[in-house]
């Protein structure tokens, strides 16, 4: 025999909050009679002395329990990586994984560049040396393999995402479709040899076929080695007030008033809100004390679990050898560890994101093929088409990826971008924080405000953005040029500033100033430049990501410019479940002199379809409460009774 007690909470004083938590999870109120409830307040984690006191009449059971716990020797290795081993194809000469990666890169570069110069060779050799040193060749080969699978099976893949476009190895392997040298992207922003951590390659796929790529991974590495990742919905300050208030039967108006006293934002805590808001402090000391007290205990706890929208994990063997699994009520299997925890134990996690806009591009290309029998390779379109930039300059960007908000359209009209660099900068600037620099950027771009640099050495890093820090990579360049930092050190400085790690920031500031002085700057000027970096770097955007997403924006803009009816039809079809968005897109069609016909069971199909350059038939699947199967039956009947119902369109 051994001694055990049920432990539902850490300390006895949490029993009231625990009762509230049960009600939140079961959708009950504290006042409900027939609800799940623990008897008493003893279901907490007991101390050693408490256990001895409880079971003092059973000394043998106590000894058995001690022996049992002493025999447990659980060690979870946190330093090792557990990457699945990439199997080199049997017909390949090289059996060394690093050599094989090098061979694939050499082959890929020939497809990407007409002339492979010294700069290209040096960059590739450097990146490969870092990848070899860090032991990540398998990671790149595995990623390249499933991306190649997607492309071969005509599953739309994005040009890149996050910091991965900063790698020429990723470009050579076809993982990304962005030339990092052309856009002055920095490898260390993606993979820092001084900071041992897994590379992070996020991939965008067509939203409708993302699952097919996951199935491919399972077919290669085994069903038991690949699964999706759990994510936990946490109770933040506002949410926990609303949940606790409901369970304690306070009126909606009372709870709503208290919740709105808390500043918005996921990182705002109740303690912070209580310090900032005197009204909330007053409330917490009066009739709502129990509500606030229970909410403070439950704040940050898990409310529910769900499947991460993008996360996939691949293990070198059965996942159960590395991580516990969870089966949802719907039967879906995920890890019990979230993304950060999986990374901490060294498992390979990837983000497979379903991007609607890639589906729109794919559907548009299909419609073009149907109407004109033309094959469009979206990755090979002219990236300097003045007609496309004219569309952006007019602000006609409804339906254009990343550029369709009203505020963005107004800034585009002012900027009038004439090249991809303008789109990249605007994409990075139109975000909270850097948005304050947009007007200044536009004035300088048009020569209405003088471009000035705090020091002439800054021109090299800031010339492309008219002296304004826009990108995180520019912060790294400044540290490299001014203070002599290596790009790895510069990335550490960028991270410290971006994440506001004060101890590391102070250390980096001291090193920056000393390096700048050694480079001939005065201490005052060095401090001035670091203060400038500190001010803007926390808002700086990842240029690699901005470049990749601006490419998608341009591709959608190109399709809208040259195949307007097809593009708008595909966009409308992709948004059929969003009535408000359908209305916005139909209004845009009117501005473009394209008529969207009213739904007509005799003339419409399931999806929106272009009838000609100026007319689109309404997709019946956009009609609420009408299912696809019913529509298919109706259309089959029409096809049976009338071979060409659309021939009668006005």
Would you name each region that the model predicts?
Residues 4-5, 9-13, 640-647:
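Conserved small/polar residues in nucleotide/adenosyl-binding loops
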Residues 8, 12-18, 80, 84:
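Flexible glycine/acidic-rich beta-alpha junction loops that bind and position SAM and/or redox cofactors
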Residues 21-29:
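Acidic, His- and aromatic-enriched active-site or binding-groove loops in soluble protein domains
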Residues 31-66, 197-221:
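Phosphate/diphosphate-binding loops
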Residues 60-84, 234:
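Structural signature of the thiamine diphosphate
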Residues 90-642:
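Noncatalytic, beta-rich nucleic-acid-contacting surfaces in large DNA/RNA-processing enzymes
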